[in-house]
């Protein structure tokens, strides 16, 4: 049911309930407060198109038999002139459910709505004027992005698109942890490679990174190459093996550039890259710590500075500043989130791995301790579980590129069908291979709830049949494009007249099911935004593709009867648009040919 029709029906039922209350209880309509009307689609098609339980909600307070009350509501609704054209019939079922049958015209109205709104169909402005910051990926610049980062990128970008579909002003942000111990390990790893050492050699640092990418960084540093991240200044390799700081700067810039390339291949863009190091350079960390001290939220013990996190629900107080003067890792996180609040983002969503669960209470407690009006649940967190990669029936745990894990780029190349010799050499890959791999990876990685573990089956991603969910959905779009092109060619037709086509021939069971699924798209997006659940879009697209394939397999489209043919083409054109709109939300292409 379209949102406009749903709102109309909810209003009608609310008014009718008030009328029934007045007639049976003698209570004035103005004084009677009707419960919120909830409309749901019955699980069994034979039970109608919409179900409502308002009679059972009111039975006790009105001291009425729920079935009798439901019948009174049904009679009053069907007698209301405003219900004509929207409701075809209604009946009472079970203990007092009201099952409604919508008119054929109201079901078919979704096609006109799709044609009128096109790419905007499904979108809403209900959250217009509200700003939200979505932080995701936020990888250390110490290596290529791994598949966990890929899941974050797919979730974060899709979630941002879902929120934007409801009118939110969405700000995508990547937080670079470029000031920790890992950066020091990156520098000594690159230095060791520059000295000609490799993993396993005497003198190879114990904490070093072993991936082949370290050798690439060292080579370019020695050759005096220049690298830069998308938002950074160019850094030239100094070539001095002894200058560890120069090596560090070059290695960080090199890997930030590599991560930029990974994200570009994945089709993900950010509005801002925020560097942890800037928090120290600008004195933000010290400022936040001093504010917490001034607020009386800290104490000193055994030479360390502690934060009273138990005041805000943590299981124990936490060390902020160690006895050697260095800060624990969650302190800059508190400072960083204070900047989010100060920048005007009253709604913030962090997408992180489930291994970050322990930091949530600490960060929130630190923000509460500042006493600047930040809500207790700030920020929101969406934690995702790990991704296991399967290829050729075996779990893949390492790659040559990274040394100890599978990278996002590995996954894109494998899922795109890269042949041996192309892997780890993106310049050898054609755009179609990258697109196919990107589509598969993005669709797969949001096709499960974030808090469930996910097995990424590369072999499944390569299949071109109904077993592969992204192929199944994209093929529905391509199949429709093919049919419409054939219609244009065979009958000399064009799509300009489709918005005014007579839709009354769309009265079959399969056509009706497809129409109803199309009408669910706007509410699905609203639900996905409210629940921070982008996987709902993937679920919906699979269901929509299924309804289309069922319709197409049951009913021939290019029939001799012109009215029936044009009505079915209009249905297909609307389905094509909604498939494209949904795929765009999750960052997946809608190919016209496959």
Swiss-Prot record:
Disulfide bonds: none annotated. It catalyses: tRNA(Arg) + L-arginine + ATP = L-arginyl-tRNA(Arg) + AMP + diphosphate. Its main location: cytoplasm. SUPFAM superfamilies: Anticodon-binding domain of a subclass of class I aminoacyl-tRNA synthetases (SSF47323), Arginyl-tRNA synthetase (ArgRS), N-terminal 'additional' domain (SSF55190), Nucleotidylyl transferase (SSF52374). One of its GO terms (cellular component) is cytoplasm. CDD domains: Anticodon_Ia_Arg, ArgRS_core. Its EC number is 6.1.1.19. Keywords: Aminoacyl-tRNA synthetase, ATP-binding, Cytoplasm, Ligase, Nucleotide-binding, Protein biosynthesis. A motif ('HIGH' region) lies at residues 139-149. GO terms for biological process: arginyl-tRNA aminoacylation. InterPro entries: aa-tRNA-synth_I_CS, Arg-tRNA-ligase, Arg-tRNA-synth_N, Arg-tRNA-synth_N_sf, ArgRS_core, DALR_anticod-bd, Rossmann-like_a/b/a_fold, tRNAsynth_Ia_anticodon-bd. GO terms for molecular function: arginine-tRNA ligase activity; ATP binding. It is found in: Cytoplasm. It holds the Pfam family DALR_1. It is an enzyme of class 6 (ligase). Gene3D superfamilies: Arginyl tRNA synthetase N-terminal domain (3.30.1360.70), HUPs (3.40.50.620), Isoleucyl-tRNA Synthetase, Domain 1 (1.10.730.10). Belongs to the class-I aminoacyl-tRNA synthetase family. Monomer. PANTHER family: ARGININE--TRNA LIGASE, CYTOPLASMIC (PTHR11956:SF5), ARGINYL-TRNA SYNTHETASE (PTHR11956). This is Arginine--tRNA ligase.
């Amino acid at each position: 049911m379209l949102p406009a029709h749903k709102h109309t029906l909810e209003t009608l039922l609310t008014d009718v309930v008030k009328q029934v209350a007045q007639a049976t209880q003698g209570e004035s309509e103005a004084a009677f407060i009707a419960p919120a009307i909830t409309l749901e689609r019955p699980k069994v098609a034979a039970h109608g198109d919409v179900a409502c339980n308002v009679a059972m909600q009111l039975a006790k307070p009105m001291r009425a038999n729920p079935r009798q009350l439901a019948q009174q509501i049904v009679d009053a609704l069907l007698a209301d002139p405003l219900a004509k054209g929207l409701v075809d019939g209604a009946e009472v079922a079970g203990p007092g459910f009201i099952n409604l049958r919508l008119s054929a015209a109201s079901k078919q109205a979704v096609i006109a709505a799709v044609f009128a709104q096109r790419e905007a169909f499904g979108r809403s402005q209900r959250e217009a004027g509200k700003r939200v910051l979505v932080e995701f990926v936020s990888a250390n610049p110490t290596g290529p992005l791994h598949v966990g980062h890929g899941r974050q990128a797919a979730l974060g970008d899709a979630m941002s698109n879902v929120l934007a579909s409801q009118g939110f002003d969405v700000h995508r942000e990547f937080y670079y942890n470029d000031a920790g111990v890992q950066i020091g390990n990156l520098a000594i790893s690159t230095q060791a490679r520059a000295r000609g050492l490799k993993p396993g050699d005497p003198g190879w640092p114990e904490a070093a990174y072993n991936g082949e990418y370290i050798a690439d960084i060292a080579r370019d540093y020695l050759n005096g190459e220049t690298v830069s991240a998308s938002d950074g200044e160019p850094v030239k390799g100094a070539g001095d093996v002894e200058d560890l700081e120069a090596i560090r700067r070059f290695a960080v810039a090199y890997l930030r550039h590599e991560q930029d390339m990974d994200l570009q291949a994945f089709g993900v863009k950010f509005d801002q890259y925020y560097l942890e190091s800037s928090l120290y350079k600008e004195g933000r960390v010290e400022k936040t710590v001093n504010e917490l001290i001034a607020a009386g939220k800290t104490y000193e013990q055994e030479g360390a500075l502690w934060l009273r996190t138990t005041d805000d629900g943590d299981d124990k107080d936490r060390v902020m500043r160690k006895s050697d003067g260095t800060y624990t890792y969650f302190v800059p996180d508190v400072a960083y989130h204070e900047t989010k609040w100060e920048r005007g983002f009253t709604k913030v969503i962090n997408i992180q791995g489930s291994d970050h669960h322990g930091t949530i209470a600490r960060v929130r407690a630190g923000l509460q301790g500042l006493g600047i009006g930040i809500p207790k649940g700030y920020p929101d967190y969406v934690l995702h579980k790990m991704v296991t990669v399967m290829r050729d029936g075996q779990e893949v745990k390492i790659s040559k590129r990274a040394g100890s894990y599978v990278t996002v780029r590995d996954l894109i190349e494998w899922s795109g069908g890269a042949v041996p010799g192309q892997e780890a050499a993106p310049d050898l890959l054609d755009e179609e291979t990258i697109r196919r791999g990107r589509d598969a990876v993005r669709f797969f990685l949001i096709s499960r709830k974030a808090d469930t573990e996910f097995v990424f089956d590369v072999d499944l991603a390569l299949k071109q049949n109904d077993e592969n969910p992204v192929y199944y959905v994209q093929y529905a779009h391509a199949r429709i494009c093919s049919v419409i092109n054939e219609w244009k060619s065979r009958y000399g037709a064009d799509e300009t007249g489709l918005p005014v086509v007579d839709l009354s021939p769309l009265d079959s069971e399969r056509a009706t099911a497809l129409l109803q699924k199309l009408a669910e798209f706007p509410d699905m997006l609203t639900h996905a935004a409210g629940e921070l659940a982008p996987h709902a879009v993937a679920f919906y697209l699979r269901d929509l593709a299924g309804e289309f394939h069922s319709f197409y397999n049951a009913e021939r489209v290019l029939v001799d009867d012109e009215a029936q043919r044009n009505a079915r083409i209009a249905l297909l054109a609307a389905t094509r648009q909604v498939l494209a709109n949904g795929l765009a939300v999750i960052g997946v292409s809608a190919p016209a040919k496959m």
